[in-house]
Amino acid sequence: MPSFDVVSELDKHELTNAVDNAIKELDRRFDLKGKCSFEAKDKSVTLTAEADFMLEQMLDILRSNLVKRKVDSQCMEIKDAYPSGKVVKQEVNFREGIDKDLAKKIVGLIKERKLKVQAAIQGEQVRVTGKKRDDLQEAIALLRGESLGMPLQFTNFRD
């Protein structure tokens, strides 16, 4: 039976490249020079600036560099800014994997449309199986059309 997996993966190399490009762009910006910094740790980035409006500009720089490197900005989880001495800091975490709630929502969407496919939750991915390839492509089109708050990829398509 044909099947495919619905996953949400983050390319860590592209993420580090985007953060490095954002750091280079910060060095070139005259209004932010020497006052702001990005610190990357695994799947989180800490933004440090002197004022809140600078944090907003830094977030825009980070988003634009993520888009240039083809990393979906929907996986960003932006936390509230907090003061730390004379500077203001903000954490940005990058989510990866499909959590239980999103997996249930995906399965519910597929069942709600009464497509001729079955969806099963397998850890951090959802396996969709069906009798025909066309049914699977219909399910892919359905999931691409929905905005679920996380970027989805479709892998392991088997005939």
From Swiss-Prot:
Keywords: Nucleotide-binding
Segments passing through the bilayer: none
Single Gene Ontology MF annotation: nucleotide binding
Signal peptide: none
InterPro entries: DUF520, UPF0234-like_C, UPF0234_N, YajQ-like_sf
Single GO cellular component term: cytosol
Highest taxon of source: Bacteria
Pfam families assigned: DUF520 (PF04461)
Function according to Swiss-Prot or TrEMBL: Nucleotide-binding protein.
Membership in a protein family: Belongs to the YajQ family.
Name of the protein described by the UniProt record: Nucleotide-binding protein PA14_57130
Organism (species): Pseudomonas aeruginosa (strain UCBPP-PA14)
